[in-house]
C-alpha cells in the first residue's frame, strides 16, 4: 500500500474503497473483503445511507482500528444543524473516531458552509475526528474558506478521471498542499473501453482500471474506486 503524507504529518493510504450504493449485507461484505485483501482507506457519507453497514464491516473484519483511515461526509442540507449529522455518523459507524470528516459539497449558502466547517472543527477538538476537509470544492470555495478560517482544509475529494482531469483544481491543491482524493475514477464504467487507455493497458500487461488507479497515484492523488 502506498501512502501520502498530509501537511499535519498524517499518512493516508492512497488507494481506498468508495462505498457509494453499498447497501445492507452487501456493503458489510464489501468492506470486509476489501480489508482482507489490503485496503486501509474506507470512504462513506451521510448521503449514502450506509454508514451503519460500513461500520459493521469494519468491526466484523477484526482489524485494529488504528490501521484504517475512515472517511465520512456531511450533506449540505445538514449544514445549519451539523451536530445532528455528526452524532448520527458516530452512532451509525459505531467506531471510536473518524479519521477524516468532509463537507460533501460547498453549498451556495456561504454562512451555512462556514457554520458547518466551524462545527466540524469543534468536534475535531472533542476527539470525534482526527481531521476535517471538504469535497467537491473549487478554487474559489477553498479560497473563501481560507479567508474565514486562516488555513486550507487538509483534503478535497472531487471527481477525477483521465476524461475529467480538473487541471485548475489539481494545480491549486498541489500548490497549497491539499491532498486530493479522486472519486468516480472509472467514470461510472464508461472509460474502461477508451481505445487509448486499452492500448496503454495492453502494452503494460494490465487492465484499464489498473492504469487509471496508477495514473492517479503517480499524480499524488488518493483514489477511491467503488
Residue ranges, per PLM feature:
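CE4/NodB-like, metal-dependent polysaccharide N-deacetylase domain
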Residues: 83-103, 122-126, 147, 178
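Short, acidic/polar
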Residues: 22-35, 78-94, 112-115, 140-143, ...
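A short, structured active-site edge motif that brings together acidic residues
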Residues: 65-78, 99-106, 160
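Conserved, mostly hydrophobic/aromatic
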Residues: 17, 34, 42, 54, ...
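N-terminal binding-site loop/beta-alpha segment at the start of enzyme catalytic domains
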Residues: 1-68, 119
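Acidic-and-aromatic substrate-binding clefts and catalytic sites of carbohydrate-active enzymes
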Residues: 22-25, 45-53, 75-81, 108-111, ...
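Short, well-ordered coil/turn segments that N-cap beta-strands
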Residues: 10-15, 38-41, 63-68, 95-99, ...
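Beta/alpha (TIM)-barrel catalytic core signal, keyed to glycine-rich beta->alpha loops juxtaposed to Asp/Glu
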Residues: 106-226
